[in-house]
Regions:
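Canonical alpha-helical transmembrane segments of integral membrane proteins
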Residues: 32-43
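Cytosolic regulatory regions of ion transport systems
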Residues: 2-34, 48-57, 62, 68-95, ...
Length: 626
């Protein structure tokens, strides 16, 4: 019987879920349980001497039946008529039995039901789930979409066990409403508890999980300590699993995805192996919500069956003879804005840099660009020791439209400006770059960076946007990365008309829902060729898709290719049918740091390489679907 549930406590989970429904469900379950009890008592009474089971209930107040004195069954002459004392004793015993049945038993049953319901609703109930489950630690706003992603794969888990500090009813409601297949509700188990507590962690039985996701809580619960607590949770989890696995040499390594809210923290853990002692038990996989969205927007998933509303950064593939450059303008150096810039810097590399010296340009526009630039350059100090960049304070420029010098630089190969000079750390005479004079050449970095201080409503910045969108040799993309939804929409729809017409696409961040931008697009659709149709929403919490299996598979193939011998060819191995994913996976799990490089940095190098393949293939003239 228990094979279906795996453990008796799982049966309690099913009972709790049933009893926590509406009144009719509770009534039906109590009626069912009481009926079973009465049927059992009736059968016992029949076995004890009643000629029909129903008489056990009809004569419940007849002391003779309770004492087995029914003259129809027993010999009344031999036994005699019951005395008054016997009748009184029989009546007392019958009444006590009735009180026990109708009072104590019923009250106990109702109290038990109420307690089970309360424990279920509050998330205090715990169930012994040890097989075929995924553990999610934290109830961050992405938990609903993560559940949908896990339940839409081919091999879906039997259970998804969630531990978090938010109200469990609220979490359940969010998840249930977002589930594409409502039949999957029965797979969701929610516990309430602090993720920093080892007791709560152990209640998940994490050593038995298929996968573990540490996503943490929202800002109201975690504040600025989100990343710190998530890392502490990982170490607690790692030490516990190490204790449980001390004598198990055949234990399979568990993937443990750890979310970092801040780009700086996430970037740091992409380059370090933080848990070498237990890396054979837990596969530490850091990820960032905002970078995940940036990949979703900038890196098309060619294997996905869903329609993609996001365009690549170019209009037509850029080959070695093209004069065009890609220009990504990011309004707002928010978490999303920084993630978009980093992802673009990973993928926007084109062959016309080698042949024509054309560089991709990434521009930040922010009210506090000077301060944010300092943080950004400090975070990627090595990059800015070899990359050209400049800072422009649009607030200090005289406004007056085209009567003053515009600071947009249309020369992608050798940007020159009389007033707003570019810093070139590889060639400037006064440069203090460590790499100057290292004979790296001018063709080492093909991306330039701009930091423009000012509001998007500033006339000088609007002139800059017009110039950028009007440049025939520039494919201009705008990303409005303002976290406040109405502000982002307002900034997008009030762009100059020339910008709306001349831009390749205008991405508008929407934190919760795309209703505003979708309504604008729907209204604009009625007017053929309306420029507001170029507005595309992104960043919505209910559309985040943390499904990196296809990208990871490509990264593993790239890593496998690096390990091939001089006489081996991946294309021949693939075409001959000799390529086995087991070997590819083995080369990934057994990868070791090369020449002092951490394993984690090598993995991320392969993953970013995989993300850039779409653009490289496009530059070769290979069309999508070929």
């Amino acid at each position: 019987m228990w094979e279906k549930f795996g453990h008796p406590r799982k049966l309690f989970f099913i009972i709790d879920r049933r009893l926590s429904g509406n009144f009719m469900k509770q009534f039906c379950w109590i009626f069912f349980i009481v009926s079973i009890i009465l049927i059992i008592l009736g059968l016992l009474g029949w076995w004890a001497g009643a000629d029909h089971p129903y008489k056990t209930f009809i004569h419940i107040f007849n002391p003779q039946y309770d004492f087995g004195l029914n003259p129809e069954i027993l010999n009344a002459e031999a036994i005699g008529t019951p005395s008054h004392l016997q009748r009184i004793i029989g009546f007392i015993i019958t009444m006590i039995g009735s009180l026990l049945l109708t009072g104590l038993l019923t009250t106990t049953l109702i109290n038990w039901v109420d307690r089970r319901k309360e424990r279920w609703q509050s998330g205090e109930a715990r169930y012994h789930i040890t097989k075929d489950f995924v553990a999610i630690i934290g109830t961050h706003k992405m938990v609903s979409n993560l559940c949908n992603t896990l339940l839409s794969k081919g091999d879906i888990p039997r259970w998804i066990v969630i531990l978090g500090s938010r109200d469990t009813d609220e979490v359940r409601k969010e998840i249930f409403e977002s589930l594409i297949d409502k039949n999957h509700r029965k797979r969701i188990v929610v516990y309430k508890g602090d993720r920093s507590s080892k007791l709560n962690i152990t209640s998940l039985n994490p050593e038995k999980a298929r996968e573990i996701y540490i996503i943490g809580e929202n800002f109201p619960e975690d504040g600025f300590d989100h990343d710190t607590v998530n890392l502490e949770t990982y170490y607690t989890l790692s030490s516990y699993i190490a204790e449980k696995a001390c004598n198990d040499t055949k234990r399979k390594r568990i993937k443990c995805h750890v979310m970092f809210e801040y780009q700086s923290t996430f970037t740091a853990f992409q380059y370090f192996d933080i848990d070498k002692a237990n890396c054979h038990l837990l596969d530490f996989i850091p990820f960032n919500y905002y970078e995940n969205w940036a990949q979703q927007v900038l890196v098309p998933d060619l294997m996905s069956q869903k329609p993609n509303i996001y365009k690549p950064l170019y209009d037509t593939p850029i080959d070695s003879e093209s004069k065009k450059r890609v220009h990504l303008i990011i309004v707002g150096m928010s978490k999303m804005g920084v993630a978009m810039a980093i992802e673009a810097a990973q993928v926007a590399h084109f062959p016309n840099f080698s042949s024509r010296g054309v560089r991709t340009l990434i521009t930040f526009i922010d009210r506090n660009a000077a301060r944010e630039m300092t943080f950004f350059k400090g975070r990627f100090s090595n990059l800015f020791e070899i990359s050209r960049h400049r800072y422009v304070d649009a607030n200090q420029l005289p406004s007056g439209g085209y009567t003053v010098e515009h600071f947009y630089d249309a020369n992608p190969s050798s940007p020159v400006s009389k007033t707003h000079k570019w810093l070139d750390p590889m060639n400037d005479v006064d440069s203090t770059s460590r790499f100057k004079g290292e004979n790296l050449g001018d063709k080492i970095v093909d991306i330039d960076w701009e930091f423009i201080e000012g509001d998007i409503s500033n006339p000088n910045i609007r002139d800059y946007l017009i110039d950028a969108a009007s440049d025939p040799d520039s494919v201009t993309n705008l990303a409005i990365c303002l976290p406040v939804t109405p502000e982002a929409v307002s900034a997008a729809i009030y762009l100059p008309e020339k910008v709306l017409h001349g831009s390749h696409q205008i991405l508008v961040q929407q934190s919760t829902t795309d209703a505003l931008v979708s309504a604008i697009r729907k209204g604009s659709d009625a007017i053929n060729g309306h420029p507001l149709m170029k507005l595309v929403p992104f960043g919505m919490i209910d559309r985040s898709n943390y499904d990196t299996e296809r990208r990871d598979l490509l990264a593993k193939l790239i890593n496998y290719t690096y390990g091939l011998g001089p006489d081996e060819d991946l294309s021949k191995i693939y075409s001959s049918g000799e390529l086995r994913l087991k070997d590819v996976e083995k080369s990934w799990t057994e990868m070791k740091g090369n020449k002092g490089k951490p394993l984690m940095s090598m993995r991320w190098s392969n993953m970013y390489h995989a993300s850039a393949i779409y653009y490289k293939v496009g530059s070769l003239g290979i069309q999508e679907g070929a």
